[in-house]
Amino acid sequence: MFSSLYPLARASLFKMDAEDAHHLTLRMLGAAGRTGLACALSPRVPDAPRTVMGLSFRNPVGLAAGLDKDGAAIDGFAALGFGFIEVGTVTPRAQPGNPRPRMFRLPEADAIINRMGFNNSGVDQFVKNVQAARYRGVLGLNIGKNADTPIERAADDYLYCLERVYPFASYVTINISSPNTKNLRQLQGAGELDALLAALKDKQRRLADLHGKLVPLALKIAPDLDDEQVKEIAATLLRHDIEGVIATNTTLSREAVKGLPHADEAGGLSGRPVFDASNAVIRKLRAELGDAVPIIGVGGIFSGEDARAKLAAGAALVQLYTGFIYRGPALVAECVKAIARG
């Protein structure tokens, strides 16, 4: 029912400011999840089990971080058939993010530009929301740094968030690739990344001993990397035994949307224009990593065939964001069925 109604809902939502529509959708999904209405209206999604990072996934199609930054609608999203859910990015302290307007649709290109800036209610409220959810499937918790934390102290924020979310996460994503927090992408540099991952792995080992379980770490990287940078990141992942990598975040490139309304807005571009760049990074990572580190592919998936292409490039799992906004819940089932066909 959601799938058949979504085109009508989208027509109304797309007449609204993009961020207002986003918040309205979150409130509706949150309410639907709490009342059980989402389950009653959701499309049938077949099981297509996968085991990745030592975790059992109902199917390989997940929700990407960013749609539910505070973990307020986990049950609503889960009812739509996703094989796993990732929420965040969360920071140690609540922060408002960048000034509005900060989210722009480019429907001619099936794209979105956002410069949200890790707006969130802080890790304490985030953990409360996660604990309140009834969902018991694979749940990724995505962590970042506060905007006013100097980049030299970024590790402190990641370590603090890791400690807070660890008991409640199936896996934890280290987001160092958002273009909307000043200097954040510097952490992708070889020296900076080596130091950060060393600290996080040490913390992970101590938390595993404390809680009696090893929660995998995944690193989320940008599409705007040259071959040498991808090689350096891959080598660092292997050196520190990082359990997963998510490729990719949004792009700063505007090559594919030149001349379109809002194309010159600052921020990260997501959607169809990032599809090829994301796949290229996935292929390069797979060549460097072999089968040692699984890849979660995200960026520009608008069809089942797009999801299959991500897996063909080397991903073990995929995530949806902008395609889900444009296509709605039907895209989840379409991707799962296409992947299950092989």
Curated annotation (Swiss-Prot):
Free-text cofactor note: Binds 1 FMN per subunit.
Compartments, record wording: Cell membrane
Major localization class: membrane
GO cellular component terms, semicolon-separated: cytoplasm; plasma membrane
Enzyme class: oxidoreductase
Annotated catalysed reactions: (S)-dihydroorotate + a quinone = orotate + a quinol
Active site residues of this protein: S178 (nucleophile)
Residues involved in FMN binding: A65, G66, L67, D68, K69, T89, N142, N175, K220, T248, G271, G300, Y321, T322
One BP annotation, GO: 'de novo' UMP biosynthetic process
Pfam families assigned to the protein according to its UniProt record, in alphabetical order: DHO_dh (PF01180)
The entry's keywords: Cell membrane, Flavoprotein, FMN, Membrane, Oxidoreductase, Pyrimidine biosynthesis
Cofactor: FMN
Lineage top rank: taxon: Bacteria
EC number: 1.3.5.2
GO molecular function annotation: dihydroorotate dehydrogenase (quinone) activity
Pathway: Pyrimidine metabolism; UMP biosynthesis via de novo pathway; orotate from (S)-dihydroorotate (quinone route): step 1/1
Protein's membrane topology: Peripheral membrane protein
Entry binding sites for substrate: K69, N114, R115, M116, G117, F118, N175, N180, N249, T250
Function: Catalyzes the conversion of dihydroorotate to orotate with quinone as electron acceptor.
Family in the record: Belongs to the dihydroorotate dehydrogenase family. Type 2 subfamily.
Known partners and oligomeric status: Monomer.
PANTHER family the record matches: DIHYDROOROTATE DEHYDROGENASE (QUINONE), MITOCHONDRIAL (PTHR48109:SF4), DIHYDROOROTATE DEHYDROGENASE (QUINONE), MITOCHONDRIAL-RELATED (PTHR48109)
Protein name per its UniProtKB record: Dihydroorotate dehydrogenase (quinone)
Annotated organism of origin: Burkholderia pseudomallei (strain K96243)
Gene label: pyrD
